[in-house]
């Protein structure tokens, strides 16, 4: 079986990587800071849609800087012990002659499931914290709430979809190397269907070339189909808000694998950002509320009603703006926001969990229940903590999150103290008061 072209013609060096100049610059600065022994971040997260070259970029970096690449796939190493074992292998395995050091690549971290892969995220964070070598993580969608601890621990570097002309240069080079006749119109068609995915475009080019011996527009139309891919939340929002036709808006909703209730949260958060006119905002929210109603009914009555949910979430919101009826209408660019509702849930859960463990630690030290510690001893502990912070940090083995909770509670007590110590001064009243005794 012939070697797949996307592997055969994969870039070997950073200079050969097309269209990612900003990402390459950031990556080079990061690896050089590591080689100097002063990295600002021990790990980077390369993120972007499938086929943009995340793994390729990591491999090219290792080759340029003569680093031995130690690759792990997060979707294969799914728990605490697996990742720890592979990390230990990376740290003790000797390097090949002539190699300066190692580069650890952890692929597809967004393939981890917070529940099914319990401990995996913690293991990766532990690996980052203790590593002696630079670490690169990759993800298609890094915005999953379960990956938030990772996002906070790494440098984020975005890789963008390949635009038409860089992708066309890649395909032309392959045609020349394989001595295949390729029509420009055929390459344009393949690029359009690939939606910026270089791997998909190269695979389609190879399929046509090996099937016919050359590549013409008619041949490409016979074999190449639009790439079937999942839309991320930002693409889904753009698909809805920027749609000019009914089918475009509906496809934006049906082509994404995001949970429908979660997508509603995204739409809810971003409708006011996209639409300026208050009547447009009202119509959009009216459509969204009806979509929510039909989604609930579909669960109770029958899934046939789900089509109405799609119609209202997509076209209903897309055409809430009457401005779209104007021939000159152009959707404004908006930096879409992650749903605050989900962020707040995540924050409050983190605080609750940290407070719970803090109360348990204090309770164990003073032999009291969690409830009694909260109600009777916590205020005294806060005062004591201000004076003996280092000692208590060590004795109770407090985590950073638990320390943050103490600071939060301490600021609350300090605020209360100010109110008590600095009351509003009032002139004493000169009016005589008389007490009355109630007759029995």
From Swiss-Prot:
Organism superkingdom: Archaea
Keyword Nuclease in annotation: no
UniProt record, GO biological process: DNA replication
SMART domains with a match to the protein in the record: AAA (SM00382)
Annotated TM spans: none
Keyword Ion transport attached: no
Molecular function in Gene Ontology: ATP binding; ATP hydrolysis activity; DNA clamp loader activity
HAMAP family in alphabetical order: RfcL (MF_01508)
Quaternary structure annotation from Swiss-Prot or TrEMBL: Heteromultimer composed of small subunits (RfcS) and large subunits (RfcL).
Task of the protein: Part of the RFC clamp loader complex which loads the PCNA sliding clamp onto DNA.
Name this protein carries in UniProt: Replication factor C large subunit
Gene name in the database record: rfcL
